[in-house]
């Protein structure tokens, strides 16, 4: 039988994943103003339509980014919870020995 171990540093990694997701979400929020407020290159209809199309695609990309960052936050929280459970069980078992 192989020995089973758990690295207590997993909680720190989970916290880093959550922090990275928060930074990614903040970056997307910051970028939203620049992406949606693009000024057309010229006064013609094509430039106006291109600016609208770019803004529309940008909004979709920002929504996908927000969803991805929320998923990373949930994953980091799950890792933190699991690591906390492992650490608590290990500490309890060590105290009984």
From Swiss-Prot:
Belongs to the mycobacterial PE family. Coiled coil: none annotated. InterPro entries: PE-PGRS_N. Disruption phenotype: Increases efficiency of DNA conjugation when disrupted in donor strain. DNA conjugation in M.smegmatis is unidirectional with distinct donor and recipient strains; mc(2)155 is a donor strain while MKD8 is a recipient strain. Mutations in a donor strain that alter DNA transfer do not always alter DNA transfer in a recipient strain. Pfam families: PE (PF00934). This is Uncharacterized PE family protein PE35. The gene is PE35. Part of the ESX-1 / type VII specialized secretion system (T7SS), which exports several proteins including EsxA and EsxB. Plays a role in DNA conjugation, in at least a donor strain.
